UniProtKB/Swiss-Prot annotation:
Name of this protein: Glutamate 5-kinase
Gene encoding the protein: proB
EC number per UniProt: 2.7.2.11
Family: Belongs to the glutamate 5-kinase family.
UniProt cross-references to PANTHER family, sorted A to Z: GLUTAMATE 5-KINASE (PTHR43654), ISOPENTENYL PHOSPHATE KINASE (PTHR43654:SF1)
BP term (GO), one: L-proline biosynthetic process
GO cellular component: cytosol
Reported function: Catalyzes the transfer of a phosphate group to glutamate to form L-glutamate 5-phosphate.
Transport found in the keyword field: no
A GO MF term: RNA binding
Positions bound to substrate: 59, 146, 158
Assigned keywords, A-Z: Amino-acid biosynthesis, ATP-binding, Cytoplasm, Kinase, Nucleotide-binding, Proline biosynthesis, Transferase
Major site of localization recorded for this protein: cytoplasm
InterPro entries in the cross-refs: AceGlu_kinase-like_sf (IPR036393), Asp/Glu/Uridylate_kinase (IPR001048), G5K_ProB (IPR041739), Glu/AcGlu_kinase (IPR001057), Glu_5kinase (IPR011529), Glu_5kinase/COase_Synthase (IPR005715), Glutamate_5-kinase_CS (IPR019797), PUA (IPR002478)
Length: 378
C-alpha cells in the first residue's frame, strides 16, 4: 500500500493541467465514454472546491468525429482529418460542459495552435484569458484547433499541447492520463522483465530510451511524446505524472499525495525557470523610466510595475515584448514583458487604471509589467 503522504509534489500543487488521451475519452474509438468523462469531471469539481485551479486538455475530437462519420480507420488525408475534428469537437465539448455542469462547475472551450503560443502578443492574450477563467472557477477545456491547422494534425499531439499550456499558465503540475499504467524500463508487452518506473527526473536522457514508440491507433502520441512533454513542462518548473486514466479516483488520490503512475520531477522552481527562459530567449525592445517610489516597489517590494509610476517611455515595442525598467538616473533595475505597446504606454503613463478605458478605448491589465513577468537586474 502506498504512503498517502509520500508524494508532496502533487499534494502541494495549486494549479494543475490535466491531459487525457483520445483512447480513454472515446473508449478505444467506440464513441465518447460518458461514464469516464463524468468521473473525471466529478474529480475536477472536487479539486476546484478544494481551492485548486484546473485546466483540462482533452484529445478525442478526431476520434469522436470518426465514430460519428462511421469511419473505422483513421484517414490519412488532411482534409478528412479536419472534417472529422470539426464533427467530433461538437460532441466532445458538449459532453464536458454537461458533466461539469452536473457538478456545479462552469466550463469554457479554448482551441489553440502552437502558433498561438509562439507569438508573444497572442501568448499573453491566451494567458490572460485562461487565468481569468481560472479565477472565475471555470474549467477551460482545451484542444488543438485541428480543423484549421494542417501540420498540427500531421505532426502535433496533445501531450505537447498540455506541456505548453502548463508553461503558459505556470502550472505546478501536469497530469497525463493515458491507457498505460506509466513508464516501464522496457515495453512490458514485449519484455516480461520490464520494471515499472515510479519516479525519475524530468529530462533524464535515459527516459527516452525506455519510452520506445508504443501508442494507440486511435490517437497520435505514444509514451515517448509524454516523456518529451514532461521535459518541456519542467522547463517552467512543472512536474509531470503519467498515470492510467481508468485508475479509480486517480486525480483525487494524486492530489492527496498518493504515488500513482510515474512521477517525473522538475528540477527547477517554477518562478526561476520562467524568468530564466525570459532572460535567455527574449530580445530587449524598449524601456520605461519610473519614479523612485515605483523603483522601490519593484526592487524591494517585489511588486508589479504600474503605469502611474512611469515617467517616460523609450523605443517602439509591442504588447508581449521585453522592456527594460529604468530608475530616474537611467539605470536599469529590471526587465519584463510589457502588457501594453509603447504607443499605449505613452497614453497611460502617470495614469491610474480607472482612466485606461477612456484613454485606450478598452480596459486591459492594471499593470504595465506584472511581477511574475519581471526579472530584477543585477
Amino acid at each position: 500500500m502506498h504512503d498517502p503522504l509520500g508524494n508532496p509534489v502533487l499534494r502541494n500543487a495549486r494549479r494543475i493541467v490535466v491531459k487525457v488521451g483520445s483512447s480513454l475519452v472515446t473508449n478505444e474509438g467506440r464513441g465518447l465514454d460518458a461514464i469516464a468523462i463524468g468521473q473525471w469531471c466529478e474529480q475536477l469539481a472536487a479539486l476546484i472546491k478544494d481551492g485548486r485551479e484546473v485546466i483540462m486538455v482533452s484529445s478525442g475530437a478526431i476520434a469522436e468525429g470518426m465514430k460519428r462519420l462511421g469511419w473505422s480507420l483513421r484517414p490519412k488525408a488532411i482534409h478528412e482529418l479536419q472534417a472529422a475534428a470539426a464533427v467530433g469537437q461538437m460532441g466532445l465539448v458538449q459532453m464536458y460542459e454537461t458533466k461539469l455542469r452536473e457538478n456545479g462547475i462552469g466550463s469554457a472551450q479554448v482551441l489553440l495552435t502552437h502558433a498561438d503560443l509562439a507569438d508573444r502578443e497572442r501568448y499573453l492574450n491566451a494567458r490572460s484569458t485562461l487565468l481569468t477563467l481560472l479565477q472565475l472557477g471555470v474549467v477551460p477545456v482545451i484542444n488543438e484547433n485541428d480543423t484549421v491547422v494542417n501540420d498540427e494534425i500531421k505532426f502535433g499531439d496533445n501531450d505537447t499541447l498540455g506541456a505548453l499550456v502548463a508553461n503558459l499558465v505556470e502550472a505546478d503540475a501536469l497530469i497525463i492520463l493515458t491507457d498505460q499504467k506509466g513508464l516501464y524500463t522496457a515495453d512490458p508487452r514485449k519484455d516480461p522483465a520490464a520494471q515499472f518506473v515510479h519516479e525519475a527526473k524530468a529530462g533524464d536522457a535515459a527516459l527516452e530510451a525506455m519510452a520506445g514508440g508504443a501508442g494507440s491507433s486511435i490517437g497520435r502520441g505514444g509514451m515517448i511524446t509524454k516523456i518529451l512533454a514532461a521535459k518541456r513542462a519542467a522547463g517552467s518548473g512543472a512536474s509531470t505524472v503519467i498515470a492510467w486514466g481508468r485508475e479509480p479516483e486517480a486525480l483525487i488520490r494524486l492530489t492527496q499525495g498518493e504515488a500513482i503512475g510515474t512521477l517525473l520531477v522538475a528540477q527547477t522552481q517554477k518562478t526561476q525557470a520562467r524568468k530564466q527562459w525570459m532572460a535567455d530567449h527574449l530580445q530587449l525592445r524598449g524601456s520605461v523610466t519610473v519614479d523612485p517610489g515605483a523603483a522601490s516597489m519593484v526592487q524591494v517590494g517585489g511588486k508589479s510595475l504600474l503605469p502611474i509610476g512611469m515617467t517616460g517611455v523609450q523605443g517602439d515595442f509591442s504588447r508581449g515584448d521585453v522592456i527594460a525598467v529604468k530608475d530616474a538616473d537611467g539605470v536599469e533595475i529590471a526587465r519584463g514583458l510589457a502588457n501594453y505597446s509603447s504607443a499605449e504606454a505613452r497614453l497611460i503613463c502617470r495614469k491610474v487604471s480607472s482612466e485606461f478605458e477612456k484613454l485606450l478605448g478598452y480596459t486591459g491589465e492594471s499593470e504595465m509589467v506584472h511581477r511574475t513577468n519581471l526579472i530584477l537586474s543585477r
